[in-house]
Amino acid sequence: MTPLPERAAALPGIDDAVLHAVATGSYHDPHSVLGQHQVAAAGIADPVTVIRTLRPLAEAVFAVLPTGAYLELAHLAHGIWQGVDIAGPGAYEIEARYADGSAWSADDPYRFLPTIGELDLHLIREGRHERLWTALGARLRDLGGVTGTAFTVWAPHARAVRVVGDFNGWDGTLHSLRNMGSSGVWELFVPGVGEGAIYKFDLLAQSGDWVRKIDPMAQLAETPPDTASRIAVSRHEWQDGEWMRRRAASDPHTGPMSIYELHFGSWRPDLGYREAADQLIDYLGALGYTHVEFLPLAEHPFGGSWGYQVTGYYAPTSRFGSPDDLKYLIDRLHRAGIGVLLDWVPGHFPKDDWALARFDGQPLYEHADPRRGEHADWGTYVFDYGNSQVRNFLVANALYWLEEFHIDGLRVDAVASMLYLDYSRDADGWEPNIHGGRENLEAIAFLQEVTATAYKRNPGTIVIAEESTSYPGVTAPTSSGGLGFGLKWNMGWMHDSLQYIREDPLYRSWHHSRITFSFVYAWSESFLLPISHDEVVHGKGSLLGKMPGDHWQQLANMRAYLAFMWAHPGKQLLFMGQEFGQPSEWSEERGLDWWILDQPAHRGLWNLVCELNAVYRGAPALWAHDNDPSGFEWLDGSDAAGNVLAFLRKDGRGEPIAVILNFSGAPHTEYRVGLPFAGGWEELLNTDADVFGGSGVGNFGGVTAVEEPWMGSPASAVLTLPPLGALFLKTGR
């Protein structure tokens, strides 16, 4: 090997242990050794420019200067080469020659300044970087005409970090990141690495062991079962400006919201994001839904988790296409007038050893105490909500989906598991908070931060809680101590109403309170009524399968039940397949039973859902005052013997909708119902109509109310109530 030139012999020495650590990729600050440096040399007045590079197997190494001149470097130690550039600091490339006659040349990653700025580092230290995805991860950069990728990762416990990938043979020795101080961030710009490259990080734990991990901030990943992160570039140009302007000026609470919940992989199997656009828009448009809610689309390794065990929080699953393909789908939905909601899972994450778990060799994203850091039921870890950087990771992730993908709302999964320290734990399996209580104060503060930040930055969006307890103030504003959610799933309504509708009509009178109790607390929170995927799996059967009686009676019960759901105060959500009465339980492994739409009875149910949505969207009484008791009035909630409910939904403008439900198996003739006005009332909807598969019992399109008071109402009308049916009446005034 070439000896050091005489001038280099006057350079200050570097400790051999440091050189060895650099050579093995285990040094925290490789840029302090490698790259280009101005150093003082003994006997020389001015600083000299020293170039050092790591090429452990080379026979000869040169720095190729902008002039085209070759500066030969000498071997220093452990594969590190060094030379003095008499021309002074400037750009250069490294060329290495090997014993087999091959040569390699590239820009030196260690000659570049940090690609992450002081403001970014300050915000990360403080846990306040609301656009974290623009600072961390893998970002394509052009630095002085040199294109490449800036890799940045937060790993505060690591002793060293290397990036490995298909661009370096999965050997990160030549690509060690520098530590950026107290921020816990590591950074390296690698020239020549571009879009589509796959990579992971190798992290040296305090224990001395190396762990290989995906990038927590990656915006794309390999398709499972492969797990590497992939460099992505977005080129999508949004065309939904009008939708976004309307959204920012609207209040989702006072508008219609009818949600179709969808598991992407089993709605129509083999469709990708882009390919699904036309079919999904046509289908949702025909049904009349205002919104679609996707089960989680963030990357997850196990399809059987339905997306609820996330490993790539910033990466849409690549099973169905690229991030731009998903943006295209959302863009198309918006232009078709359909809002998009997304399930979001900040409550727990899986223990896969290549993902977030023990990320830098010890608990980082998860709480270190298993009493707070593990979900035994699910076999997952729980985020450490008291760690400001972990909280920042999650808050920024919510914003990422809202802002980068134009998502209109997030449904937060398993909120109850976050709120309570003793959730699904034995008496000795949890630790009280600082006040001796069971509430998880850090998680509560996190949820408040998520909702407040989401609404501040993205007006018109909504954050929805799947929360199954009686925790107070879930939808109360954070300014008054609430969690700030826009809506809460009404699990009480769901459980009670399903228990009621399962009963044979002969025995429902004994369970009348189950169908009326939800009206007692309907305005204690802002509610959404869910018949979700959770109710049609794990042996629960389909919604149709919950209905008693023969096939006709099952469908009639279901028509009446859905009408009750649409008429009840609160927004509504129905899982895919239930709109046409799928008989079989849902499975993520196969598609829906689309063939059953060829059967007239099931097509009739589908027609009813179309009509329910059309009536709903056109009648502000059914949605304008969902969260205000002034939008509801009982006409008769006490007829347990007849299995009848009658109530008004009101819009505040004198155009109410009267809803009369007969959950008995027989028609009621000459049935008097109180109404607020005398005069004609149009039969706006009859679930027993022939077109819906019913028996055709009804009131010939309308009734006339007379000024005969009844049960507190100033007028009344005599009706025929169809069996297992619902009527919506609209005043003809």
Swiss-Prot record:
A molecular function (GO) term? 1,4-alpha-glucan branching enzyme activity
Does the record carry Transferase as a key word? yes
Which pathway does this chain act in?
A: Glycan biosynthesis; glycogen biosynthesis
Catalyses: Transfers a segment of a (1->4)-alpha-D-glucan chain to a primary hydroxy group in a similar glucan chain
- Record's keyword terms, sorted: Carbohydrate metabolism, Glycogen biosynthesis, Glycogen metabolism, Glycosyltransferase, Transferase
UniProt-listed Gene3D superfamilies: Glycosidases, Golgi alpha-mannosidase II, Immunoglobulins
- InterPro entries per the record? A-amylase/branching_C, Branching_enzy, GlgB, GlgB_N, GlgB_N_E_set_prok, Glyco_hydro_13_cat_dom, Glyco_hydro_13_N, Glyco_hydro_b
Q: Where is the active site?
A: 413 (nucleophile), 466 (proton donor)
Q: Name one Pfam family in it.
A: Alpha-amylase_C
* EC nos: 2.4.1.18
| GO BP term, pick one | glycogen biosynthetic process
The record, for NCBIfam families, names:
branching_enzym, PRK05402.1, PRK12313.1
Give the similarity note. Belongs to the glycosyl hydrolase 13 family. GlgB subfamily.
What does the annotation say about its assembly with partners? Monomer.
What task does this protein carry out? Catalyzes the formation of the alpha-1,6-glucosidic linkages in glycogen by scission of a 1,4-alpha-linked oligosaccharide from growing alpha-1,4-glucan chains and the subsequent attachment of the oligosaccharide to the alpha-1,6 position.
Q: In its UniProt entry, what is this protein called? A: 1,4-alpha-glucan branching enzyme GlgB
Which organism does this sequence originate in? Answer: Leifsonia xyli subsp. xyli (strain CTCB07)
